[in-house]
């Protein structure tokens, strides 16, 4: 079967093609979709390559939101001064695959794929990320936490494109942290993922904490049960609590790695929290507006 290839230069053109050409799929990084095509899991009639849409290839902070375009790669995130000021996000971006994969893979693609073990998607969940979705009918803004319907299933419609991801610009009273545990040291799919975003008062005590967990159940999830428990605690107290408290939201599935996940989940949360608190203690955290 012949597969048509489209290479739009504008977002509106891509949205029109997606609406008009039945059976087509989008490709930006392609690290997930190309594997599915090669394995015969999907047989599209057409491929819409949106990598040439330059308006979706920027990272900016306007003081209200950090904006990450739908075509931005993990390598771009690693090199971005904007992402570099958000320690948990920078660490998550650098944890994805290998250097070669990070040059092409995108967080937008991983969010859309909804793999349970997607590194950066789990961290972005803790940052309260919103997706700006575009179709021929206009824009729709939806919170990342609301799109997941199950493993590899989302509420993103077949005619919608992730124009950008955005989350609130962090201030000097906020810190972020990220941890992943796997059996091998490199290029292994994460078995446990934890993201943390904390807001502290002038004495370094926790005012609020958002914890995200990935690779433990069908989708990445938030864990408010632990976030509520560490309110009012300082760094050391919060870490000690995290090491002892297993969040109910983890909901571990039966799997070969279940015992490993039971033994390491609390450690991952504690590590992410430690990094987040440490980020608030550094005096150089002025999240100035910037761009890639």
PLM features: residue spans?
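A glycine-rich beta-strand to alpha-helix segment
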Residues: 276-292
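C-terminal structural segment of proteins
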Residues: 1-274
């Amino acid at each position: 079967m012949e597969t048509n290839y489209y290479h739009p230069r504008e977002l509106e053109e891509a949205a029109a093609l997606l609406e008009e050409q039945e059976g087509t799929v989008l490709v930006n990084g392609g690290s997930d979709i190309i594997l599915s095509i090669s394995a015969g899991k999907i047989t599209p009639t057409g491929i819409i390559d949106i990598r040439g849409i330059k308006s979706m290839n920027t990272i900016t902070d306007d003081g209200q939101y950090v904006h990450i375009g739908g075509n931005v790669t993990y390598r771009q995130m690693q090199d971005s001064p904007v992402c570099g000021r958000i320690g948990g996000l920078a660490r998550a971006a650098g944890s994805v695959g290998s250097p070669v994969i990070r040059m092409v893979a995108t967080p937008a693609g991983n969010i859309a794929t909804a793999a349970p073990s997607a590194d950066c998607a789990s961290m972005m969940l803790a940052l309260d990320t919103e997706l700006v979705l575009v179709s021929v009918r206009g824009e729709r803004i939806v919170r990342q936490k609301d799109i997941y319907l199950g493993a590899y299933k989302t509420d993103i419609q077949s005619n919608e494109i992730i124009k950008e991801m955005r989350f609130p610009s962090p201030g000097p009273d906020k810190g972020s942290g990220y941890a992943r545990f796997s059996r091998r040291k490199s290029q292994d799919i994460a078995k446990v993922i934890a993201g943390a975003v904390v807001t502290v008062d002038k004495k370094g005590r926790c005012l609020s904490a958002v914890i995200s967990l990935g690779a433990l159940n069908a989708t990445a999830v938030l864990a408010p049960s632990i976030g509520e428990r560490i309110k009012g605690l300082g760094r050391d107290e919060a870490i000690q609590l995290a090491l002892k408290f297993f969040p109910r939201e983890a909901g571990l599935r039966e799997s070969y790695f279940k015992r490993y996940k039971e033994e390491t989940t609390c450690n991952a949360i504690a590590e992410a929290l430690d990094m987040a608190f440490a980020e608030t203690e550094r005096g150089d955290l002025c999240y100035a507006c910037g761009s890639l």
